């Protein structure tokens, strides 16, 4: 009985360690340094926009780039909604660039790289949700390397709904994380994963 109990405890601890490890693996963050732009990509636009705006107000970059279209062609692009939030928070419109046509993270990366090249920018801080940061970083790194001369640093959005240690204990965190893991697996396997 004692061996069973000890085995159960060790097994449960191992499973919890793996689940916590997954959260920490997805939530990639680099040391903050000043850049030419702060890029927030669509998805959970509230937390992402708020984090990008806070970084802009702290002087990390002179330009905000909001990237993301709308799933409904009749509605306003996510990037435009983030811009409105930033302007309402006191960011001057001339300190904001909008890319409102991308529908996937891969398109975010390509269109942001185009925008940065067109403006002569070379460095960015990439802001997205913590559970999305790893996959976004892979896609942005591929695109930025392909275009040459572009660099970015990861800075996950402050997201009170997602905890890297406890994501597996409740929804929607659990669902978001599992979907993200599936997309990351598809990306690593060489399939398109948004």
Question: Which functions belong to the PLM regions below?
Answer:
Residues 1-29:
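N-terminal type II signal-anchor transmembrane helix
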Residues 3-4, 49, 184:
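Hydrophobic alpha-helical segments, especially transmembrane helices
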Residues 9-10, 55, 142, 190:
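Enrichment for repetitive, rod-forming helical segments
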Residues 18-21, 25, 52, 185-192:
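Structural signature of transmembrane alpha-helix termini at the membrane-water interface
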Residues 18-23, 45, 174-183:
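Charged, low-complexity, helix-prone segments enriched in Lys/Glu/Asp/Gln
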Residues 23-169:
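A structural signal for short, hydrophobic/glycine-enriched beta-strand patches
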Residues 169-194:
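A transmembrane-helix-recognition feature enriched in membrane-embedded lipid enzymes
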């Amino acid at each position: 009985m004692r061996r069973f109990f000890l085995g159960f405890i060790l097994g449960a601890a191992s499973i919890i360690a793996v689940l916590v490890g997954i959260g920490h693996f997805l939530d990639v963050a680099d040391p903050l340094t000043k850049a030419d732009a702060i890029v927030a990509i669509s998805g959970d636009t509230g937390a992402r926009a708020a984090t990008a705006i806070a970084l802009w107000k702290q002087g990390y970059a002179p330009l905000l780039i909001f990237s993301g279209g709308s799933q409904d062609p009749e509605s306003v692009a996510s990037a435009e909604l983030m811009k409105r939030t930033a302007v309402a928070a006191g960011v001057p419109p001339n300190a904001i660039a909008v890319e409102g046509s991308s529908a996937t993270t891969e398109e975010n990366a390509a269109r942001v790289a185009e925008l940065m090249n067109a403006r002569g920018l070379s460095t960015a801080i990439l802001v997205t949700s913590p559970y999305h940061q790893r996959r976004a970083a892979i896609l942005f790194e591929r695109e930025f390397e392909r275009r040459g001369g572009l660099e970015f640093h990861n800075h996950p959005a402050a997201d009170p709904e997602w905890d890297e240690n406890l994501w597996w204990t409740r929804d929607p965190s659990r669902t978001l994380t599992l979907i993200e893991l599936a997309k990351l697996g598809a990306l690593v396997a060489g399939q398109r994963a948004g």
